[in-house]
Amino acid sequence: MDRTDIAHLRRCIELARAARGGGHEPFGSLLVGTDGTVLQELTNTVGSGDVTGHPELALASWASRHLTPEACAGATLYTSCESCAMCAGGQYWAGIGRLVFALSGEQLADLAGGTTLRLSSREVFARGNVPIAVDGPCPELASDAASVFEGLWPSS
């Protein structure tokens, strides 16, 4: 993980804060192309009533509709918290070649008091035959990434 990765993760954490401020769960993600251009950035929209309104899944859907398979393979999905099994599956099927996250799913589960599905993105990707690189969690940003959840659950 390099400085550019960390800068993108910081933006994801900002997006997560914005999502929470808008009445949604605090998750933010962005998709970066092979040339380093930010292609899309999204926040969680579960508060609108759609439990699948995760930004990673929406970005995977966008990528599969707007990018070539080669562009997807060279793209990186950055997210404030490790993608859940649903979102990792979406990334796999879209063919997005790399995932980078600040906070791990296990760290999130500890904050949430165990209310999450404990299946890491690495485990999801390992079941497929298309390699997807995974970088995370980011110790440098763990505290900041966790802070967006303060007071959201009784254990946080």
Briefly describe each language-model feature range:
Residues 1-18, 90-156:
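Zinc-dependent deaminase
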Residues 12, 16-19, 29, 40, ...:
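Small-residue (primarily alanine) positions within well-ordered alpha-helices
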Residues 22-26:
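Short, flexible loop/turn motifs enriched in small residues
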Residues 27-36:
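Short beta-strand scaffold segments in enzyme catalytic cores
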Residues 39-46, 104:
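Short beta->alpha transition motifs characteristic of CBS
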Residues 48-58, 62:
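A short, polar/charged loop-to-alpha-helix boundary motif
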Residues 69-81:
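Immediate flanking context of iron-sulfur cluster ligation sites
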Residues 81, 85-88:
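Conserved redox-active cysteine motifs that mediate thiol-disulfide chemistry
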